[in-house]
């Protein structure tokens, strides 16, 4: 790709504000959602997307645990030492932050309040998993790392959940599910996976490739945790699968010159029944339908 076209593509991304990197999470979403989020919409529009309670559950569990266990945490390119507080105090701080974020609807607000009772038990499971993997090693969290592949115009950039000098850990929480019954809202546990999810393996493979440290993948709910330690050939395979998708995105941007009206002729329409699109507000939904002529 010539430099002029590369510059044009990067400038047109993020609603014309420009975007210069990919991430394991952006590469994990369906292609239509990628182009909606990172070509059609700018950062302000992305922030208007309203996440459901399950998306907040991960932060409610992981952020306090990081502050409780880690000696340093990276934020906005700088590192800080978390204040010495109990785990319960860190959780309460996170509750206060999440409570300021609008709920998606009335049901989501109820679920957000009901899920709080499961946060502390989940953090207790995370603490056990971290201790099993790292022992007494000094830990850091949220450090940015990146990879750059030949021929790919974008760096892939991500933040590590837990890290020591020799080891990394990627955490996935399984929030409580709620079901409406005649007697009201009923809660039931999400079982932990018997085998790692491929999307999570790709994320872990990225952090392994970027750090060359021993990687672990952890799943946790409010009752238990599971630790997976993939073999290196598995990690190499999943990393290449993630990079293959990055090249597909780049090729589509190159063919279309990052014009959404061309992308919508090359990429299948969004499946609005998928949870990936639940966070779009009504105006965004109409804009997306118009772009794909739905």
Residues covered by each model-derived region:
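Conserved catalytic cores of phosphodiester-cleaving nucleases, focusing on short active-site segments
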Residues: 61, 156-191, 207
């Amino acid at each position: 790709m010539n430099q002029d076209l590369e510059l044009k593509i990067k400038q047109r991304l993020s609603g014309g504000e420009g975007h210069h990197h990919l991430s394991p999470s952006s590469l994990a979403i369906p292609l239509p959602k990628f182009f909606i989020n990172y070509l059609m919409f700018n950062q302000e529009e992305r922030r208007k997307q309203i996440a459901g309670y399950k998306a907040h559950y991960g932060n409610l569990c992981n952020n306090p645990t990081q502050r409780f266990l880690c000696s340093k945490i990276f934020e906005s390119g700088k590192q800080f030492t978390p204040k010495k507080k109990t785990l319960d105090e860190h959780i309460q701080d996170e509750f206060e932050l999440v409570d300021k974020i609008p709920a998606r609807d009335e049901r989501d607000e109820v679920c957000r309040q009901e899920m709080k009772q499961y946060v502390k038990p989940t953090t207790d499971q995370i603490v056990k998993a971290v201790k099993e993997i790292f022992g007494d090693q000094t830990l850091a969290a949220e450090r940015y790392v990146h990879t750059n592949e030949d021929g790919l115009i974008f760096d892939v950039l991500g933040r590590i959940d837990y890290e020591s000098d020799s080891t990394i850990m990627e955490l996935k929480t399984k929030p409580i599910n709620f079901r409406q019954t005649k007697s009201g809202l009923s809660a039931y546990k999400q079982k932990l996976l018997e085998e790692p999810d491929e999307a999570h393996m790709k994320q872990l493979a990225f952090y392994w490739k970027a750090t060359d440290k021993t990687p672990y993948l952890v799943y946790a709910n409010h009752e238990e945790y599971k630790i997976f330690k993939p073999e290196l050939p598995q990690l190499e395979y999943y990393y290449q699968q993630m990079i293959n998708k990055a090249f597909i995105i780049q090729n589509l941007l190159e063919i279309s010159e990052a014009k959404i009206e061309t992308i919508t002729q090359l990429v299948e329409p969004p499946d609005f029944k998928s949870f990936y699109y639940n966070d779009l507000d009504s105006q965004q939904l109409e804009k997306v339908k118009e772009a794909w002529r739905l």
